[in-house]
């Protein structure tokens, strides 16, 4: 009997006491959760930890009193499986269900609401019976914008609550699949943030940072979080390909957070990261380089414990980081971000040649010719031998003239159309003033009348 049928059958009335029956599915085999399948589901797949599940349910006390039903609200109930959002019995039972399945679940108090109950409808130490129908389940969306680009399904839960942070050393075993074809199978030990150098998609690294030690998960990646519009020749992955990875996070060692490092460590790590960023940049891995330079900024931006000698090094590192960030943003065509990075650099050194020039390039890229020209002119004022600035200034002026010419032509065409429309309107008005044949026959009388009127007015 389905949940809908049960609702019709009971017709709002209190049922007879419900019997305790079913297969014991409690982890301890203590008969705390008993399950009876009323209708088999389809397929072989069941929901995994972290999946969002959608169900209809009705709940009764053992005396047959109904205390709750999603059917009465005509709205499916959803929750994240295995996250403690519902009573223990539900997390246990729904994990065993297939889509379309209907089952009865009997839950002892320790797997339901315990000695506290849930006043006013559920008394203390109550054994409950539920009928649950599973409609669908889907993996956990790990993307910030919830665009479905990184979906995780947890096969095996990990230990504890700690997760790898940026820069953590992780040990993983992974398998990559494209259309069920195994294209990558490796055991790796690497630093989070350097996955691209190992031909790992950025989305996979993001997923690893959400895993716990010992966790085994399936990760589904949309193209923008995988190998994008380029694909990966090494693995024979075409452009715009969706991928699936099986990942086992064996172990990890978290990187020190900024607040855990002293000033000497921050300087030392900043120099190491700067060199790493330079290597990535030269290899054309601009996103990876970007991550390295951002680390330096986060470590040094608001640090106040440096000595006078250290502050000179800090100033130089911060300036270089903002300039390098600007260059990465330019390469990635993120022009607003490039301008922001240049502004940060120019706050540290208002006459910096690279800061002014790169900001001018960003302004030019978005057709903000006045601001671009001002930046290039200042570069030439301070550094007259800068040939690149002279070239870009000429380009800026040329494009300004082209834009003015286009605007002039646009306005000329606009005025020409307006003039034509005005002339057409006048012509139509004039044509409408001509008398008809009928009016012409009565013209003498009209003229006489007009003359009389003129005399009267005179």
UniProtKB/Swiss-Prot annotation:
Principal cellular location given in the protein's record: cytoplasm
Biased composition, class Polar residues, residue ranges: 447-458
Q: What is this protein called?
A: Peptidyl-prolyl cis-trans isomerase FKBP4
The residue ranges of the PPIase FKBP-type domain are 50-138, 167-253
**Could you tell me what reaction this enzyme catalyses?**
[protein]-peptidylproline (omega=180) = [protein]-peptidylproline (omega=0)
Q: Extract the signal peptide range.
A: none
The subcellular localization recorded is: Cytoplasm, Cytosol; Mitochondrion; Nucleus; Cytoplasm, Cytoskeleton
Q: What is known of its domains?
A: The PPIase activity is mainly due to the first PPIase FKBP-type domain (1-138 AA). The C-terminal region (AA 375-458) is required to prevent tubulin polymerization.
N-acetylthreonine modification, residue list: 2
Q: Where does this protein come from, organism-wise?
A: Rattus norvegicus
Give the Gene Ontology MF terms in alphabetical order. Answer: ATP binding; copper-dependent protein binding; GTP binding; heat shock protein binding; nuclear glucocorticoid receptor binding; peptidyl-prolyl cis-trans isomerase activity; phosphoprotein binding; tau protein binding
Give the Phosphotyrosine positions (modified residues): 220
N6-acetyllysine found at: 282
Question: What is known about the tissue distribution of this protein?
Answer: Widely detected in the brain (at protein level).
How this chain assembles, per its entry, is:
Homodimer. Interacts with GLMN. Associates with HSP90AA1 and HSP70 in steroid hormone receptor complexes. Also interacts with peroxisomal phytanoyl-CoA alpha-hydroxylase (PHYH). Interacts with NR3C1 and dynein. Interacts with HSF1 in the HSP90 complex. Associates with tubulin. Interacts with MAPT/TAU. Interacts (via TPR domain) with S100A1, S100A2 and S100A6; the interaction is Ca(2+) dependent. Interaction with S100A1 and S100A2 (but not with S100A6) leads to inhibition of FKBP4-HSP90 interaction. Interacts with dynein; causes partially NR3C1 transport to the nucleus.
Annotated region Interaction with tubulin: the residues are 267-400
- Modified sites of kind Omega-N-methylarginine: 373
Q: Which gene encodes it?
A: Fkbp4
Q: How is its activity regulated?
A: Inhibited by FK506.
Query: Cross-link Glycyl lysine isopeptide (Lys-Gly) (interchain with G-Cter in SUMO1) - where?
Result: 441
Task: Summarize what the UniProt record says about post-translational modification.
Answer: Phosphorylation by CK2 results in loss of HSP90 binding activity.
Please verify whether the record's keywords include Iron-sulfur.
Answer: no
Q: Which residues carry this modification: Phosphothreonine?
A: 143, 436
The free-text function statement in the UniProt record for this protein reads: Immunophilin protein with PPIase and co-chaperone activities. Component of unligated steroid receptors heterocomplexes through interaction with heat-shock protein 90 (HSP90). Plays a role in the intracellular trafficking of heterooligomeric forms of steroid hormone receptors between cytoplasm and nuclear compartments. May have a protective role against oxidative stress in mitochondria. Also acts as a regulator of microtubule dynamics by inhibiting MAPT/TAU ability to promote microtubule assembly. The PPIase activity controls neuronal growth cones via regulation of TRPC1 channel opening.
